[in-house]
Amino acid sequence: MSTASAAAVVKQKVEAPVHPMDARIDELTDYIMKNCLWQFHSRSWDRERQNAEILKKTKELLCGEPVDLSTSHDRCYWVDAVCLADDYREHYPWINSMSKEEIGSLMQGLKDRMDYLTITGSLNEELSDKHY
């Protein structure tokens, strides 16, 4: 394999997102990585959709906002979000004293971190294999 060909195979390094609430995001990320199977879908588009929908619904639940349950997909994501929100409230009591704006920022930072760890920063080449 030529040097040019080898360089083309190497995945471009993506930097992890930085957020003001990194320490708290680390705690929530660690919980997901150890307890949530939904992070392990085999394709990047599945992971993108699940990260977005589950974490959006988790944020809505934590903020006491209405949650869209109009489709079967919405209800499926909602089930995971209910479990995650309940566990976050129990295991990380500091989340209960945060404002809606702080929770929104925290959950966006968490989504960015999960996208990085499970998609953009992942070395798993199967995520982008068109034949998989």
Curated annotation (Swiss-Prot):
One of its GO terms (molecular function) is iron ion binding. The keyword Zinc does not apply. Its cofactor is iron-sulfur cluster. The keyword Iron-sulfur applies. GO terms for biological process: nitrogen fixation. It catalyses: N2 + 8 reduced [2Fe-2S]-[ferredoxin] + 16 ATP + 16 H2O = H2 + 8 oxidized [2Fe-2S]-[ferredoxin] + 2 NH4(+) + 16 ADP + 16 phosphate + 6 H(+). It comes from the Bacteria. Hexamer of two alpha, two beta, and two delta chains. This is Nitrogenase iron-iron protein delta chain. The lineage of its organism: Bacteria, Pseudomonadati, Pseudomonadota, Gammaproteobacteria, Pseudomonadales. The gene is anfG.
